[in-house]
């Protein structure tokens, strides 16, 4: 079996000098395979903040504790399991104003962050009512995901491999070489974002229409194949 380097591949090799140290010194071809799967999300994760500011720390703390318990109890009533809720420790932050270089105490903020995972999006309206009733101050973040994420990512990876194989075959279809063994496979960073639910507290009390939309699972990889001379 002999290796043969074509003018085209010489051009590709010198076009990408940054790859010189990671590529074989014999004829080869480098391809990028990509594949994307669209899916309808079925899980919503929210990070919520319950807070209150006052000059009496104990009173503010008791209010946060009561509202936290109300929220957790309400979430349980709509079918959200204990494992799908988590509460952080209370955060106590004093606030001051400055007047003529003098520091004036104006109150202390007591807050707690609660994370909620909703696995049945048909209960979204119930979740919103629970959040409003508990006087949640802010939604820090929201994330839509799929319960089939592992399977979908594996399918996307298989698709990316097939895409790379197809591209490689097309590129050498009219050349005197053929695709040989694989030299290396390297994953490429895709950082596919999950769309946020775009929830605003000011709008929640007016309407709770919610469309989960679509999320994407994208995989990308780089494959280097040896090129071998056709027999």
Describe the residue ranges of each PLM region.
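Sec-dependent N-terminal signal peptides
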Residues: 5-10
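Short, charge-dense linear interaction motifs
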Residues: 2-4, 15-231
């Amino acid at each position: 079996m002999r290796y043969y380097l074509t003018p085209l591949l010489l051009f590709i090799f010198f076009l990408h000098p940054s790859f010189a140290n990671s590529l074989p010194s014999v004829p080869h071809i480098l391809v990028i395979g990509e594949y994307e799967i669209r899916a309808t999300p079925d899980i919503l994760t929210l990070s919520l903040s319950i807070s209150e500011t006052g000059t009496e720390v104990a009173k503010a703390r008791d209010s946060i504790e009561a509202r936290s318990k109300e929220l957790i109890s309400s979430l349980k009533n709509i079918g959200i399991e204990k494992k799908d809720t988590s509460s952080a420790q209370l955060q106590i932050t004093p606030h001051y104003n400055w007047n003529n270089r003098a520091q004036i105490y104006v109150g202390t903020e007591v807050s707690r962050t609660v994370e909620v995972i909703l696995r049945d999006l048909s209960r979204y309206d119930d979740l919103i009512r629970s959040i409003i009733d508990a006087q949640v101050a802010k939604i820090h973040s929201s994330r839509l995901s799929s319960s089939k994420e592992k399977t979908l990512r594996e399918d996307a990876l298989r698709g990316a491999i097939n895409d790379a194989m197809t591209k490689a075959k097309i590129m050498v279809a009219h050349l005197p070489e053929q695709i040989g063994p694989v030299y290396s496979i390297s994953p490429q960073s895709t950082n596919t974002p999950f769309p946020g639910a775009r929830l605003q507290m000011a709008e929640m009390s007016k309407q709770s229409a919610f469309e989960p939309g679509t999320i994407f699972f994208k995989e990308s990889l780089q494959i280097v194949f040896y090129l071998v001379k056709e027999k």
